[in-house]
């Protein structure tokens, strides 16, 4: 099985779309104290970039890869609800799973020097360890989770960073950046 570990912000939800969820939430909230999880799934998230979705769909069609959501958006919905949102935004495949949260599940001892990149790389590694059927995979994120991008001055019991990683460093371009699609395809071929 081929898998794309997909972040959203800075990959398919680009900086020009950030904040669009707040406009949607104003329209549907019945009371100010209403939890985000009580809102319709469409109102919980910012819109995806249409051109970024086109690139993602091309990759999915070419490779047959499945999607596992590594984005922190996963805390606001179920896999089923995220699949509904993907369909409403034009993504041709629903996610098959979310990566877990290694910190909340006490799989590791959290340290204050950790950042999102280190934690997310551990979550992806943990998911892959539980799914030996994965033959090809790539993580796509706007956080630099490459082994050279994550460095700590202290020693930890975990190996940080990912080998199969594509960094979308330009948050206003994301997956549309020149050369990004080819890098992703190289990991999935």
Predicted features, each with a name:
Residues 12-13, 75-77, 145-147:
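Short, active-site-adjacent cap segments at secondary-structure transitions
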Residues 80-189:
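C-terminal cap/substrate-recognition subdomain and adjoining C-terminal extension
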Residues 6, 70-76, 140-142:
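Short His-Asn-centered micro-motif
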Residues 1-64:
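Active-site neighborhood of HAD-like aspartate-dependent phosphohydrolases
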Residues 42-46, 72, 114:
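Short, charged/polar micro-motifs that form catalytic or ligand-binding hotspots
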Residues 3, 66, 136-138:
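Structural motif
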Residues 63-83:
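Substrate-recognition element of Asp-dependent hydrolases with the DxDx(T/V) motif
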């Amino acid at each position: 099985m081929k898998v794309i570990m997909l972040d959203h912000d800075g990959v398919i939800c680009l900086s020009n779309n950030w904040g669009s969820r707040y406009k949607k939430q104003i329209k549907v909230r019945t009371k100010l104290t209403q939890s985000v999880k009580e809102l319709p799934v469409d109102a919980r998230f910012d819109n995806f970039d249409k051109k970024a979705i086109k690139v993602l769909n091309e990759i999915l069609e070419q490779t047959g890869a499945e999607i596992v959501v590594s984005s922190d958006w996963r805390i606001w919905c179920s896999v089923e609800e995220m699949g509904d949102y993907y369909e409403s935004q034009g993504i041709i495949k629903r996610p098959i799973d979310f990566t877990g949260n290694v910190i909340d599940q006490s799989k590791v001892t959290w340290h204050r020097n950790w950042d999102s990149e280190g934690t997310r790389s551990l979550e992806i590694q943990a998911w892959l360890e539980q799914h030996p059927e994965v033959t090809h995979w790539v993580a796509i994120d706007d956080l630099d989770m490459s082994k050279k991008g994550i460095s700590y001055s202290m020693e930890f019991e975990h190996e940080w960073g990912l080998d199969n990683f594509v960094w979308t460093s330009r948050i206003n371009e994301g997956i549309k950046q020149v050369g990004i699609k080819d890098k992703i395809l190289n990991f999935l071929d």
